[in-house]
Amino acid sequence: MMIQSHPLLAAPLAVGDTIGFFSSSAPATVTAKNRFFRGVEFLQRKGFKLVSGKLTGKTDFYRSGTIKERAQEFNELVYNPDITCIMSTIGGDNSNSLLPFLDYDAIIANPKIIIGYSDTTALLAGIYAKTGLITFYGPALIPSFGEHPPLVDITYESFIKILTRKQSGIYTYTLPEKWSDESINWNENKILRPKKLYKNNCAFYGSGKVEGRVIGGNLNTLTGIWGSEWMPEILNGDILFIEDSRKSIATIERLFSMLKLNRVFDKVSAIILGKHELFDCAGSKRRPYEVLTEVLDGKQIPVLDGFDCSHTHPMLTLPLGVKLAIDFDNKNISITEQYLSTEK
């Protein structure tokens, strides 16, 4: 297996292409059937063809299959020449188990868009570390595209813009006006009631403009590959992107302190905190940003707090491994580097 010294780029997506989906951990095609079918039907209505991974509809208690079965499911989607985009169905807890069994040579020979979030971070980061392929922290089939309107439509708008756009010029994100982290209407056939929507509270703490390569994903998942050959090296000047879901404030302090003890904060030029879904503040009324500032202990690192690339809805799509620019004065975030190939 060769390891790329420069970014490897997948071909862009086009409406009408084929998306293959895999279940690298939780068996949600079984446990959340209604939401699964909603996600499938949503993408089909948008004009995409879908290929089911071999573990679709399968369950082995807490997971979709054995470690090697799950790795084989993913590899078979890589081998399929008809597939342009490989999408996670959902996260879980055990995607890191697959990393020794993925066919990295095949990924290099035929790079495809690989997208997902949460526990899929292990695959996104590990594949980038081993191949240089730019991967995408973005929607997964069941939680994201199984969501109801209007939030699913905003998620899709970012997904299609990022993955189909011509690779010229700078792309500046438009942050959604409203968001939600309510878990209602998860697997029901009918909407029980509309979700509570909150005004976007994304905040830019810092001044000037910071540019750097973005590295990261779901922080809790990154601890499962930390220190291994599948964890991308964090370099001086990188922008650290981290998000999490349903964690307690005690856990978040531990995770942020882990980063400090590993001297990550001595290297990064900025931090992006994704919105934290259903954060448990233990009655303190403190938010993850406040925990982070205490852990930083006076160290001045600009922070974009509450970026809409996380477990909340809607979700923006973020390429990992490319340069971002965060303008703290004008309060915007942009992709400044090519992240897809120019040829289909």
Swiss-Prot record:
It comes from the Bacteria. It holds the Pfam family Peptidase_S66. GO terms for molecular function: hydrolase activity; identical protein binding. Keywords: Bacteriocin immunity, Hydrolase, Plasmid. InterPro entries: Carboxypeptidase_A_C_sf, Class_I_gatase-like, LdcA_N, Peptidase_S66_N, Peptidase_S66C, S66_fam. Belongs to the peptidase S66 family. Involved in specific self-immunity to microcin C7. This is Microcin C7 self-immunity protein MccF.
